[in-house]
């Protein structure tokens, strides 16, 4: 698919597959829409699947270097306008869930349902030194001490942050395939830092009671590292009216890629129930 120049100012790359209930997948910090292709494409067998590269990632360009969660939510709404989709099921992983939540709060009529996968509502419910606005200390230190590529390696392949230790030990080739696939269109260092700052400068915990659409909180029970998404998931479930939570056993932050079949089934069952 070609890029589309949106009224939000982004020249946004997207792809659409299949037919049926519209499902928009929003990726994590720095990832492009390509990240979903090894794992989530079966969703297109029964749904209209929409992938895109957020600002600063892949083949999308935007005129400014300062990004916000609000901007990226507006981009998704503008993409739906371009595609003629009145409302869609939004599935956001990590920062993608934050973008989806911002969209749900600001444009509830455009959201049929929201799945927040390994995500959160901002810094307020999170424990630890990672929870400060702007660029977190660990990122600044890692970039200075080890460089950009090693920082990404540590996050995605060399620790249990994304994949559990047992699965990494048993599937080193799959871990490396994942890294080589996503790094091709991953945000570069400048854009990545700006995206992290956007993520850490956003807060919606005080607005969770205003969510009007059905929400599923999807979390791996081992996703309790630096950002402790397990704690964040509990906060989402407890504060969003009517929210449901599904826990994937034996999974960490990267469960869409470590357990794609289970992840896809949860998504499809949820979409069917809220069509």
Listing of model-derived features with the role each one plays in the protein:
Residues 50-95:
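Active-site loop/oxyanion-hole signature of alpha/beta-hydrolase fold enzymes
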Residues 99-103:
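Hydrolases whose catalytic domains are alpha/beta-hydrolase-1, hotdog thioesterase
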Residues 242-275:
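Catalytic active-site module of serine/aspartate enzymes centered on a nucleophile-bearing elbow/loop
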Residues 150-207:
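Conserved alpha/beta-hydrolase catalytic His-Asp/Glu region
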Residues 224-232:
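Conserved alpha/beta-hydrolase "acid-adjacent" motif
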Residues 105, 112-148:
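Flexible "cap/lid" loop of the alpha/beta hydrolase fold
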Residues 211, 217-219:
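Short beta-strand/loop motif that positions the catalytic acidic residue
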Residues 6-62:
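Conserved HGGG/HGGXW glycine-rich cap/lid loop of the alpha/beta-hydrolase fold
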């Amino acid at each position: 698919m070609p890029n589309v120049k949106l009224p939000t100012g982004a020249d946004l790359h997207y792809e659409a597959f299949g037919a049926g209930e519209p499902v928009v997948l929003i990726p994590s910090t720095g990832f492009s829409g390509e990240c979903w292709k090894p794992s989530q494409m079966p969703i297109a067998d029964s749904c209209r699947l929409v992938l895109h590269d957020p600002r600063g990632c892949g083949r999308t360009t935007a005129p400014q270097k300062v990004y916000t969660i609000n901007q990226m939510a507006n981009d998704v709404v503008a993409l739906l306008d371009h595609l003629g989709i009145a409302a869609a099921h939004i599935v956001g992983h990590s920062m993608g869930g934050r973008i989806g939540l911002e969209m749900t709060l600001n444009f509830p009529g455009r959201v049929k349902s929201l799945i927040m996968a390994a995500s959160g509502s901002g810094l307020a419910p999170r424990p630890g030194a990672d929870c400060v606005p702007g660029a977190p200390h660990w990122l600044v230190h890692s970039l200075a001490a080890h460089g950009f590529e090693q920082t990404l390696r540590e996050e995605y392949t060399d620790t249990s942050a994304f994949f559990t230790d047992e699965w990494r030990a048993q599937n080193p080739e799959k871990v490396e395939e994942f890294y080589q696939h996503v790094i091709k269109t991953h945000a570069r260092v400048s854009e990545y830092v700006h995206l992290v700052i956007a993520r850490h400068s956003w807060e919606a915990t005080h607005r969770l009671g205003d969510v009007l659409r059905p929400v599923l909180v999807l979390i791996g029970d081992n996703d309790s590292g630096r950002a402790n998404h397990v704690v964040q998931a509990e906060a989402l479930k407890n504060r969003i009216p009517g929210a449901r939570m599904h826990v994937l056993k034996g999974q960490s932050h990267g469960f869409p890629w470590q357990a794609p079949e289970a992840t896809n089934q949860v998504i499809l069952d949820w979409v069917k129930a809220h069509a």
